[in-house]
Curated annotation (Swiss-Prot):
Domain notes: The three subunits of the retrotranslocation channel (PEX2, PEX10 and PEX12) coassemble in the membrane into a channel with an open 10 Angstrom pore. The RING-type zinc-fingers that catalyze PEX5 receptor ubiquitination are positioned above the pore on the cytosolic side of the complex. The RING-type zinc-finger is degenerated and only coordinates one zinc ions, preventing E3 ubiquitin-protein ligase activity.
Spans traversing the lipid bilayer: 18-45, 50-74, 116-149, 163-199, 254-281
Compositionally skewed regions (Acidic residues) per UniProt: 323-335
Native source species: Thermothelomyces thermophilus (strain ATCC 42464 / BCRC 31852 / DSM 1799)
GO BP field: protein import into peroxisome matrix, receptor recycling; protein monoubiquitination
Originating gene: PEX12
Tree of life domain: Eukaryota
Protein name: Peroxisome assembly protein 12
Length: 439
């Protein structure tokens, strides 16, 4: 399929193949996540300075891409990644002019080069459309869990609700019902134009380029001569503007260098040579002999008896403290136990009352509520597994353990209804938020 364009009746040497265009699009799509990953790594070291930048990454990246792409469209005639593949953009004609292109390539280039209005239209396609697509995808993914919670979390606003609630409701309706169809139409239109371009039935490989009347072509000798002349004129000028132009032009060298470094690191960490070096480095380490607690001097291989017996003494002291705490808890009154339970319990943000919870089980096979072996396992949204009847009754507030506890504490405690029995966190969707586990 790579040679299909060359098998057509009319051969156009300046028309790029579909696979060149797809490679360029893949490279352009890899830049945002790569920059985001590098920024995330740096933010972990310098969160004070870079946390706000990371939170506003999409907007700042779109602004930086707008500056870089505008410079490359004005000086190179193509986007940043298109220039890396030797491609350019030009205004599309109703008919081809092969004779004029062969006789006067410089004049044809000047006649078809992008005008200022064309540059802004292409910036809208290169920067604006991907930014809008990323935002819509993120909003759709964020709304997907809410759509699965049931009708209780998707109710329409009341008649007297503020306009923000009404707008948010209709926005969620758009993301849930309309956007999947729009997303499918987006990819289907791109696929249709790609197939039409592959079989030489269209001069555009993208519907957006068709809308703005721009097509992608291979760079000719006239384009390279024009770029060299432009760089020579920029080198003669002095000032901050020429320095900025040189820095933006130097990005074309940074991209292939970074790709080479990335591929080299990928090969290095996947090769056996790197594993052998790391293994040899680990073998050369001279580790001290271990110190075993409870052995006399010299038996541990390096530590004295005092150091060896220190962990045992600490354990014995810890056991004595635990026994003292248990004896004190047995001696305290019921009021003191109630006060300590209130201090340990989570507090509701709305009622400011302590929430009744149960301790986590020592064994993962036990249900925290009934303290027996789990039957008909069900997972809560907090990740804790219960018996399905136990957690279902707990969320509805009808479990016997809840009723017994709340018999004398009504108005002083929250029963834990609608919350996780161990953590006390609110379970979205109530019983609909439970997930049965099939083993």
């Amino acid at each position: 399929m790579e040679f299909i364009p060359a098998l057509q009746a009319r051969i156009d040497e300046h028309k790029p193949s579909l696979f060149e265009l797809l490679s360029e699009q893949q490279l352009a799509a890899l830049l945002p996540p790569t920059v985001r990953y590098l920024l995330t790594v740096l933010t972990q070291r310098y969160p004070r300075y870079l946390l706000r930048v990371l939170n506003s990454f999409d907007e700042l990246y779109a602004l930086a891409a707008l500056v870089v792409e505008r410079h490359y469209l004005r000086t190179r005639g193509g986007s940043f990644t298109e220039h890396f593949y030797g491609l350019k953009r030009e205004r599309a004609l109703a008919a081809e002019i092969p004779r004029a292109s062969a006789a006067a390539p410089g004049a044809v280039r000047d006649a078809l080069r992008l005008r200022p209005a064309d540059v802004w239209r292409n910036l809208l396609v290169i920067v604006g459309v991907p930014y809008l697509k990323r935002k819509l995808d993120e909003a759709h993914e964020a709304d997907a869990p809410r759509a699965m919670m049931g009708a209780a979390y998707n109710r329409p606003p009341l008649p007297g609700a503020p306009w923000r609630e009404r707008v948010a409701f209709w926005w969620r309706c758009f993301l849930r019902r309309v956007y999947p169809a729009v997303n499918a139409a987006y990819y289907l239109s791109i696929l249709a134009f790609n197939l039409a371009y592959l079989f030489d039935n269209s001069k555009y490989h993208s519907p957006f380029l068709c809308l703005i009347g721009t097509r992608v072509r291979r760079m000719s000798a006239a384009d390279y001569r024009a770029i060299e002349a432009l760089e020579e004129r920029a080198a003669k000028r002095r000032g901050g503007r020429s320095v900025a132009a040189r820095m933006l032009g130097g990005l074309s060298l940074v991209l292939p260098t970074s790709i080479f470094a990335l591929k080299f690191l990928e090969w290095w960490y996947a090769s056996d040579f790197a594993k052998q070096l790391s293994r040899k480095a680990a073998e050369s380490l001279d580790l001290p002999p271990p110190v075993v607690a409870g052995l006399p001097t010299g038996a541990g291989g390096g530590g004295g008896s005092e150091k060896a017996q220190q962990p045992r003494r600490e354990k014995e002291l810890g056991k004595e403290k635990d026994e003292e705490v248990e004896e004190e808890e047995e001696e305290v009154s019921e009021e003191e136990k109630e006060r300590r339970a209130i201090e340990r319990a989570p507090v509701s943000a709305s009622s400011l009352l302590p929430i009744y919870t149960v301790p986590p089980p020592e064994n993962s096979d036990q249900c925290p509520i009934c303290e027996g072996e789990i039957t008909t396992a069900a997972a809560c949204q907090t990740g804790i597994v219960y018996c399905y009847p136990c957690i279902h009754k707990w969320l509805t507030g009808t479990h016997p353990r809840q009723e017994k506890f709340m018999a004398e504490r009504a108005g002083k405690w929250e029963s834990g209804e609608g919350r996780c029995a161990v953590t006390g966190r609110r379970v979205l969707g109530g019983t609909e938020g439970l997930r049965r586990i099939m083993v």
